[in-house]
Amino acid sequence: MSSLTVYHESQPEQPLKLLTHAEDIASTLAEVGVRFERWEAAAPIAAGASQEEVIAAYAHEIERLKRERGYITVDVVSLDSDHPQKAELRAKFLDEHRHGEDEVRFFVAGRGLFVLHIEEHVYAVLCERNDLISVPAGTRHWFDMGEHPHFVAVRLFNNPEGWVAQFTGDDIASRFPLLED
């Protein structure tokens, strides 16, 4: 189940709010400029589906986002517990960073924890299958895929270079809960 846990940045052990209804998650995140939606596939997606099949299943929603926000590049990222670089990738994504463009992810399968550091608060968004999250450019955040990752996500970019991070050097992520496997 998708969830949103809100903390004050100085109290990682004490959540201020825990939400599990998609509408509540979406409205709370909208207050800080983050988009959260639930999508349904237009066609069933089989295990092991190709990038093209995944994109085709969500073509209507993807095209709508491209028109609305000017995204030019779409791809599919898939990571599981057999990936040879899972530990290195997890460590990299767990460092607080920001991007010069929106970070848009739609979870086709599995789950991941997006943690957003906005002003004095930390918003931990557990994204699962059918969740779309759009983190605005410049937002400090980190991502945890867990020790045993399993996710397939559609990514949209307005930068043809794809994922380009600017790391903040802040170790705040080390003080907050990780994704439980």
UniProtKB/Swiss-Prot annotation:
Binding site for Ni(2+): H97, H99, E103, H141
Amino-acid biosynthesis listed as a keyword: yes
Keywords, sorted A to Z: Amino-acid biosynthesis, Dioxygenase, Iron, Metal-binding, Methionine biosynthesis, Nickel, Oxidoreductase
Annotated site residue numbers, May play a role in transmitting local conformational changes: D102
Biological process terms in GO annotation: L-methionine salvage from methylthioadenosine; L-methionine salvage from S-adenosylmethionine
Cofactor(s) this protein requires: Fe(2+); Ni(2+)
EC number assigned by the record: 1.13.11.54, 1.13.11.53
SUPFAM superfamilies xrefs: RmlC-like cupins (SSF51182)
Annotated site residues (Important to generate the dianion) in this chain: R105
Similarity comment: family membership: Belongs to the acireductone dioxygenase (ARD) family.
Protein name, UniProt field: Acireductone dioxygenase
Species of provenance: Pseudomonas paraeruginosa (strain DSM 24068 / PA7) (Pseudomonas aeruginosa (strain PA7))
Gene designation per UniProt: mtnD
